[in-house]
Amino acid sequence: MKLRTNAKGLRGSLRVPGDKSISHRSIIFGSLAKGVTKVHDILRGEDVLSTMQVFREMGVQIEDKGDLVEIHGCGFDGLQEPQRPLDMGNSGTSMRLIAGVLAGQNFSAQMVGDDSLSKRPMDRISLPLRRMGVEIAGQTERDLPPLTIHGNPNLKPIQYQLPIASAQVKSALIFAALQAQGESLIIEKDLTRNHTEDMLLQFGGQLKVDGKEIRVAGKQELQAQEVVVPGDISSAAFWLVAGLIVPSSKITLTNVGINETRTGILDVIQAMGGKLSVSEVDEVVKSATITVESSDLYGTEISGELIPRLIDELPIIALLATQAEGQTLIQDAEELKVKETDRIQVVADALNSMGADIQPTADGMIIQGKTSLKGASVHTYGDHRIGMMTAIAALLVKDGSVELSRAEAINTSYPDFFAHLEDLANV
């Protein structure tokens, strides 16, 4: 599709769609709890709909009533053996978290995904789950999907130190540990998003967190809850950056999730000198209103424990860095290589084709700014975040056009993205 270019300023207020991570987990916890869980403001992107359909395939009644989703939970012991392969679509979150759920079941199930997901390694979850007594069969030594999981209702507890910072691996192990015969200890490499831990407590579960150590008791029962899903800061990130780099812009985003494990992008914006304000903070839902406006920006360094707090925002942060004076260095982000695409290479290729100066490295990028961007043809390779990054970059292009191939990938997390862009551009 041909993208909007040469924007004269973006102005207005938006409510971004519900948080993808919390939406996934609300369906999983709601299915595993006893009683009817009510979820407000859930994201209706393709990934979350995949999770919803997978639990329906395992016998969970889920009613979508528009603003409200009702999940008739059946407990860990109430799931039914699926009659067909469980299709995770493009969702690595679905596959990894649900693998932990399947680990303790008394049936076998096959998990499949699309072409992109079928290239993503699952050995990071299969190795610890096998240690708990689960039989898992994948493709190649990296356990690429399809994955067949033969559940074990007598799971052994595990003591496991994560070799990488991954909320998905941590969460898979928590879901497995909840079904094990005793207490498990999970030790993080770096602190990652803690939505699973927060929601486990909300649903009446028990765990103890001490720094990077998480202790989870086995054979727990969960109780249905009412969940309000805040807006997704990963989706908000595209408008935050657009508001900073498109001249004559001022954008206000309401009800944005500000869980402390997810707000790394706000730290980066402030370090770069961006004009940003946070107001109307809701301490219960962990949400706030965030306003940004066009700013003079300066390069910075992004590395270490900051990386897990903004891993999904790094593509759009790379664009932000192209519009900052001086050098921006991104390190310790090798996890980007096993996302929907190799995001280090694909981001560099896409933005360099538009005139940026980005050198990909083994674990990140070296970005020189400030650069003028020009027209180009860019392929998403099925990666929603590459698509949205390119659409924001195109707004700065004064000469030439920007063609985006496979733009439909954006529906994975933000079906209304282009409608919201038009709202801001036409004020």
UniProtKB/Swiss-Prot annotation:
Pathway: Metabolic intermediate biosynthesis; chorismate biosynthesis; chorismate from D-erythrose 4-phosphate and phosphoenolpyruvate: step 6/7. GO terms for cellular component: cytoplasm. One of its GO terms (biological process) is amino acid biosynthetic process. It is an enzyme of class 2 (transferase). Its main location: cytoplasm. Phosphoenolpyruvate binds at residues 20, 92, 120, 168, 343, 385. 3-phosphoshikimate binds at residues 20-21, 25, 166, 168, 312, 339. InterPro entries: Enolpyruvate_Tfrase_dom (IPR001986), Enolpyruvate_Tfrase_sf (IPR036968), EPSP_synthase (IPR006264), EPSP_synthase_CS (IPR023193), RNA3'P_cycl/enolpyr_Trfase_a/b (IPR013792). It holds the Pfam family EPSP_synthase. It is found in: Cytoplasm. The active site is at residue 312. Keywords: Amino-acid biosynthesis, Aromatic amino acid biosynthesis, Cytoplasm, Transferase. Transmembrane segments: none annotated. Its EC number is 2.5.1.19. SUPFAM superfamilies: EPT/RTPC-like. It catalyses: 3-phosphoshikimate + phosphoenolpyruvate = 5-O-(1-carboxyvinyl)-3-phosphoshikimate + phosphate. GO terms for molecular function: 3-phosphoshikimate 1-carboxyvinyltransferase activity. NCBIfam families: aroA. Belongs to the EPSP synthase family. Catalyzes the transfer of the enolpyruvyl moiety of phosphoenolpyruvate (PEP) to the 5-hydroxyl of shikimate-3-phosphate (S3P) to produce enolpyruvyl shikimate-3-phosphate and inorganic phosphate. Monomer. This is 3-phosphoshikimate 1-carboxyvinyltransferase. The lineage of its organism: Bacteria, Bacillati, Bacillota, Bacilli, Lactobacillales. The gene is aroA.
